[in-house]
Amino acid sequence: MESISNQGLTLLLGGARSGKSSLAVDIASRTQREVVFIATAQALDADMQERIARHQRERPKWLTFEEPFDITSAIKKAPSSACIIIDCLTLWVSNLMMRETSEQEISSACTKSLSAISQRNGKTIVISNEVGLGVVPETALGREYREILGRVNQQWARAARQSLFLVAGKAFPLHDPKEILQ
């Protein structure tokens, strides 16, 4: 598997309500650059519609691309010097799986997105959930999702300059196991 390194890429991992999105917003706000928000959520119910509307009200000056499937095209639309937040890989992988996209195609889409990010000058902050810490999912689809998302997270972490794991609003740096074994 091809490894793309990007010095401007930060990956934020954690569970639900762990502080990932808040930290991403804080990091982006401190860059003093234009911020582009790439949202992968789909407004399929009233709760998600309200959540999306609230996020848009909270960040009216940010350029938002709602892109549940092709994040590479959204990355390429963003100004090169802008700070991008991609929120989140968790829903993106789910969206692709619901379209019956194979794991190989998902991995290829990750590679294309990472390549697009490596062409940019601005910082990119990517959010994803770590879903492998809980109980084993009851359904085959749930287990397949957990496995694919875990491998997707690893692919993005390998490319990132910095990966952080968030728990209860606290961030822990993640280290490459190869560094530990040296």
Predicted feature residues:
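Pre-Walker A adenine-sensing motif
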Residues: 1-4
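Conserved P-loop
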Residues: 6, 10-78
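Flexible, compositionally biased loop and terminal segments
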Residues: 10-13, 38, 90, 110, ...
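Structural motif
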Residues: 11, 85, 125-127
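Residue-level signal for inorganic ion chemistry
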Residues: 24, 55, 85, 129, ...
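Short, well-ordered beta-strand core segments
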Residues: 35, 84, 162-165
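Helix-adjacent hinge/juxtasegments
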Residues: 62-108
